[in-house]
Amino acid sequence: MQPMTRARIAVDAMGGDYAPDEIVAGALRASEELDADILLVGNPVPIQRYLDEHAPTAKPQIVAANDVVDMGEEPLSALKRKPKASINVAMDLVKAGAADAVVSAGHSGAAMAAALLRLGRLPGIDRPAIGAVLPTLLPGKSVLVLDVGANVDCRPKYLEQFAVMGSIYSQYVLDVENPKVGLLNIGEEDCKGNDLALKAHQLLRQNRQISFLGNAEGRDVLSGQFDVVVCDGFVGNVLLKFAESLGSVLVQILREELPRGWRGQLGTALLRPNLRKIKQRIDHAEHGGGLLLGVDGICIISHGSSQAPSIFNAIRLAKEAVDHRVSERIQACYQDAVAVEDQA
C-alpha cells in the first residue's frame, strides 16, 4: 500500500487548557513543516484573531464549530446536546471523507465517545484502545503501551485485540520488524497474575498474528525488551501518568543537586546540551498524544495541558498513522486472524 500524498488533519482548535492559541500555533507549524493539510475546527472569531495577530499571511482552512465540550461535562450527554461541538464536527469531517484524522486536546472522554458514535468500531474489534508511545533505556527505541485509559475493565479477548493492533502500529509506524509483545503483570512466570492476566496470557500465547514474549513486569516496560505492552485501561492510565511525571521529577532533582553559585552555573552550562537531549527523550510532549486504535478512522487524543510543540507532534503522529494506513491494516490483519482461527 502506497502512502497517501497529503494527509488531511482536522484539529479541534477549541479543545485543551490553552485553546485556541496554542492549538492554532501548533497547527500552523505543522502546516509549514509537514506535508499535510490542516483544518482548524472551532469558533472562527478567536481563531482568526490569533491568526491576524501572529500569522497574518497564513490562510489555513477554518471549519466553524461554535460549541465546545467542557472538561466538567458528562461526555455522552454533552455530545448529544451539542451536535456542533468542535469535537463532533471534527469527527464528522472524517466520517464524510473530508479529513483523514482528528487531533484533540480537549475532553478525552468526549473524544473517545465522539469517535465511537461518529466513526464506529472497526469490524471485528470489540473495544478500541488508547496507545501511548513511551521512551525506553535504548536510544531511539520506544515502547507502545495500550490500553492507557479507554477501558478500565477488560476481558481477556480485548487484551488480545490490543496486542494485534499494537503490533501493527509498531511494525508500520514505528518501523519495528516483528514487534515483541508483553503482557503487563506482577511476575515473569506464566502462572502469575489475576484471572484476567492468566486468561489473556493463554490467548496471547496461542495467537499466531503476534510475537508474544510473555509477561512484562513494571520494571520491564521501559527497558527496551518489549515493543508492545498490553494491559487494561485502569492499570495503563496509572502507568502513563507515572511515566509522564518522571521528566519533571528528574529535572527538579538535578536543579536541587547541582552546586550553587558559579560552580552550579558552569556545570549547568556544560550539561545543557545533554539535558536538552534527556528532556527530548522523556518529555511526553515529544510524542504528541495517544492514538485511539480500533475505530474506523485516525484519532489522536492529546494531553489537556498540551501546548504548541505537543500539538505539532500530535499532528505529526496523526499524519504517520494516515500515511501508513493503520486503520486499514488493523482491519485486514484482524480479518486474517479470524480466518486462521476458523480454519484451525
From Swiss-Prot:
Transmembrane residue ranges: none
Cited InterPro entries: FA_synthesis (IPR003664), Phospholipid_synth_PlsX-like (IPR012281)
GO molecular function: phosphate:acyl-[acyl carrier protein] acyltransferase activity
Sorted UniProt keywords: Cytoplasm, Lipid biosynthesis, Lipid metabolism, Phospholipid biosynthesis, Phospholipid metabolism, Transferase
Record's GO cellular component terms: cytoplasm
GO biological process: fatty acid biosynthetic process; phospholipid biosynthetic process
E.C. number(s) listed in UniProt: 2.3.1.274
Location relative to the cell: Cytoplasm
Reactions it catalyzes: a fatty acyl-[ACP] + phosphate = an acyl phosphate + holo-[ACP]
One Pfam assignment: FA_synthesis
Superkingdom of origin organism: Bacteria
Record pathway: Lipid metabolism; phospholipid metabolism
Bridged cysteine pairs (disulfide): none
Task performed by this protein: Catalyzes the reversible formation of acyl-phosphate (acyl-PO(4)) from acyl-[acyl-carrier-protein] (acyl-ACP). This enzyme utilizes acyl-ACP as fatty acyl donor, but not acyl-CoA.
HAMAP family membership: PlsX (MF_00019)
Family: Belongs to the PlsX family.
PANTHER family reported in the protein's UniProt record: FATTY ACID/PHOSPHOLIPID SYNTHESIS PROTEIN PLSX, PHOSPHATE ACYLTRANSFERASE
Quaternary context: Homodimer. Probably interacts with PlsY.
Protein name (Swiss-Prot/TrEMBL): Phosphate acyltransferase
Organism: Thermosynechococcus vestitus (strain NIES-2133 / IAM M-273 / BP-1)
